[in-house]
Amino acid sequence: MKLVGTRPIHTDRLVLRRWSVDDAQQMYDNLASDTEATRFVTWPPHPNVDATRLLLTGWVRGYDDPATFNWAVWLDEVIIGQIAVVDVDTRVNLAELGYCFGRRWWNHGYATETVKAVMSYLFDIAQVNNCLLYTSDAADE
C-alpha cells in the first residue's frame, strides 16, 4: 500500500476533499447531530457544533500522516457526507471503509458513487489489494 494520503476526488456529481475546521457547522447541521445518520459510525452524535469542531480539529491534524484517508463529500456547495479508511490490515493490504451521509441525501445513489470513487482511488493510487465495507439497511428502514 502506498501512503499517499487524502487527495481530492471528483465524480460526476460530487467532490471529495479534505476536511477543514471551517466545515464544522455544515457537518453538524447535515449529519453529525443526527442520531439516525450516525447510528453505525464510530463516533456518537454530536450534542453541539463545538463537538464537531473538536472532531474536525483531530481529523485535520491527522492529514500530516500520509496513511490518513478521510474525505468530506460535497454536492454543489453542501457537505452531504463523510467517508474514510477506518482500519488497515497491512498483512493482506486491506483497507476498511466507513461512511456517513445526512438523511436528506439517502436513496439518491450518493453513497454508492462515493464508495466506488474511493475504492478506485485506493486500488489505483494507493495500491490497496482489498477493500472491506460493512453496510446496513438503515436507509431502507
Predicted regions and their residues:
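Short, hydrophobic secondary-structure boundary micro-motifs
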Residues: T38-V41, W71, L132
